[in-house]
From Swiss-Prot:
It comes from the Archaea. The lineage of its organism: Archaea, Methanobacteriati, Methanobacteriota, Methanomada group, Methanococci. It comes from Methanocaldococcus jannaschii (strain ATCC 43067 / DSM 2661 / JAL-1 / JCM 10045 / NBRC 100440) (Methanococcus jannaschii). InterPro entries: DUF1867, Pyrv_Knase_C, Pyrv_Knase_C_sf. It holds the Pfam family PK_C. Gene3D superfamilies: Pyruvate kinase, C-terminal domain. This is Uncharacterized protein MJ0504.
Amino acid sequence: MKLFDYPGIQNTDETLKIAVERAKKGDIKSIVVASSTGYTAKKLLDLLEKEGLDLNVVVVTYHQGFHGEDTISMDKEVEEELKKRGAKVFRGSHALSGVERGISNKLGGYGPVQVIAETLRTFGQGVKVCYEITIMACDAGLIKAKEEVIAIGGTGRGADTAMVIKPANMNTFFNIEAREILCMPRIKKKVKEDDE
């Protein structure tokens, strides 16, 4: 397992290389990648094409309205480009927040799903994202619950975490299994140099 010093976009290229290297073993059929604008997804597709790997690539992006009413983070042109290159693009609500976040935003407090998300964040935002996008892709029928996948997530933009996960659906959430952590940040939150 590779440990990065800090989370963030600066780890994207190495995270993707580590994930693709693991995929070359041949036992993984699908890669699920979080990508808000398409930046990380395009880099992953470039690398897979370079290596001659033909995998089921599922790109999970923010739902419409995440960053403001009726806004989407991934331009339609970028989405179409990803699809033309063979990726499946899924836009949907976060599995580990959804309506529960709306209730908390309006009324305060928290719910059990938010507790799960916060617990996963103790391992890093990217770990939480990997779990979440795997569940979302599984619920959408884009991956199978019985087949291990590589999930790639990050902290903010880019990628800093890659894992092999045995997927599960939302209604069987506790059947999900982290089988391998390929890479992740050692320090979970960005720290200013003068704070160290």
